[in-house]
């Protein structure tokens, strides 16, 4: 089955689930017959969440630099089930218009996406990749065009490899690197995006990446882990 057919079938199935039984999507029991979306109240936001590495593909296109997950999956494929990687993934980079239209068709109100740090800063800091900047403008504009609220996450596990080569999250300089990166994206898109998130699960990318070895960069380094989690929290505070 090709990507388009899979996405269409998935969308149809999910749409049906939303209409008839929304809590099934969360794996929760339904105890109230007739429970509907409206019962959550007018202020509850229904949305879709995704991360750059998981959906974008185009891992080395249009000036993007490698992330630690590119390196991890290429150099340690045995760490990944079936040796998969996200070099192409869902190819959101080339199909974002259609994919966001599917979100709208499913009657979701919000699309929470993440920026690829190394698509915007190929070396992590310094030089800005204008093609990366332009891509996220197109994504955000497509959301606004269709009435889908864009929520932006600044970091979802995919540190630029150039910064990992300098010590990554275990290097205290990451606080300044993160500040430079987040300042750029918030000033660039702040007039369009009103809801922002700093990091996805800091314990996940620090513990998994620097101690448990199941996330990029895949180290067993207790001292690095302790520094990394401290620096990640410092970045949140900054």
Model-derived regions, located:
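Aromatic- and Gly/Pro-rich amphipathic surface segment
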Residues: 66-101
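Active-site region of glycoside hydrolase catalytic domains
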Residues: 33-74, 123-124, 137-238
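Short glycine/proline-rich turn/loop motifs
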Residues: 77-87, 116-121, 217-220
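Glycine-rich anion/phosphate-binding loops
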Residues: 87-97, 126-135, 172-180
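N-terminal export signals
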Residues: 5-27
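Short gly/ser/thr-rich secondary-structure transition/capping motifs
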Residues: 28-32
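Aromatic-lined substrate-binding rim segments of carbohydrate-active enzymes
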Residues: 100-155
